[in-house]
From Swiss-Prot:
It comes from Rhea americana (Greater rhea). Keywords: Heme, Iron, Metal-binding, Oxygen transport, Transport. O2 binds at H58. Involved in oxygen transport from the lung to the various peripheral tissues. The keyword Iron-sulfur does not apply. One of its GO terms (molecular function) is peroxidase activity. InterPro entries: Globin, Globin-like_sf, Globin/Proto, Hemoglobin_a-typ, Hemoglobin_oxygen_transport, Hemoglobin_pi. This is Hemoglobin subunit alpha-A. Gene3D superfamilies: Globins (1.10.490.10). GO terms for biological process: hydrogen peroxide catabolic process. SUPFAM superfamilies: Globin-like.
Length: 141
C-alpha cells in the first residue's frame, strides 16, 4: 500500500523524468532484453538492436503508461485497466516480466538521477512498480 509520502515521492520522480519517456523507456527495454533475454520472446517481430525505432516507440509507450499510473496514483487500476486486459488476454505476458521491467526501470532512474533516488524514494518507487505489476496481472486466470 502506497502511503502519502510514497505517493509524493513517486509523483516527484515522474515529474522529473516525464520529458525523457522515449529515451528512458528505450533504455529500460534494452536493459531488460540484455539482462533477461527470455523477455525477447514477446517481441519476435521487433528489431531488438540498440537504437531501434521499435524499441524507442515501445519504450515510450511503457514509460508513458507509468507516467499515467503515477498521475492517477489513487486509481492505478483504472488508469491501467485496458493495458491489464491487453497483457492478460491477448499478449499473455508472463507476470514475472513486469517485475523484471520494474527492476530495469529503477536502474535507469538511478543512472540518470542518482541524487533523486534516496533509499526512501527507491522504496516508494519499488512499491509503486509492484502496484503497477499487480494491476497488470489482476486479470490473469
Amino acid at each position: 500500500v502506497l502511503s502519502g509520502p510514497d505517493k509524493t515521492n513517486v509523483k516527484n520522480v515522474f515529474a522529473k523524468i516525464g520529458g525523457h519517456a522515449d529515451a528512458y523507456g528505450a533504455e529500460t527495454l534494452e536493459r531488460m532484453f540484455t539482462t533477461y533475454p527470455q523477455t525477447k520472446t514477446y517481441f519476435p517481430h521487433f528489431d531488438l538492436h540498440h537504437g531501434s525505432a521499435q524499441i524507442k516507440t515501445h519504450g515510450k509507450k511503457v514509460v508513458s503508461a507509468l507516467i499515467d499510473a503515477a498521475n492517477n496514483i489513487d486509481d492505478i487500476y483504472g488508469a491501467l485497466s485496458k493495458l491489464s486486459d491487453l497483457h492478460a488476454q491477448k499478449l499473455r505476458v508472463d507476470p514475472v516480466n513486469f517485475k523484471l521491467l520494474g527492476q530495469c526501470f529503477l536502474v535507469v532512474v538511478a543512472i540518470h538521477h542518482p541524487s533523486l533516488l534516496t533509499p526512501e524514494v527507491h522504496a516508494s518507487l519499488d512499491k509503486f512498480l509492484c502496484a503497477v505489476g499487480a494491476v497488470l496481472t489482476a486479470k490473469y486466470r
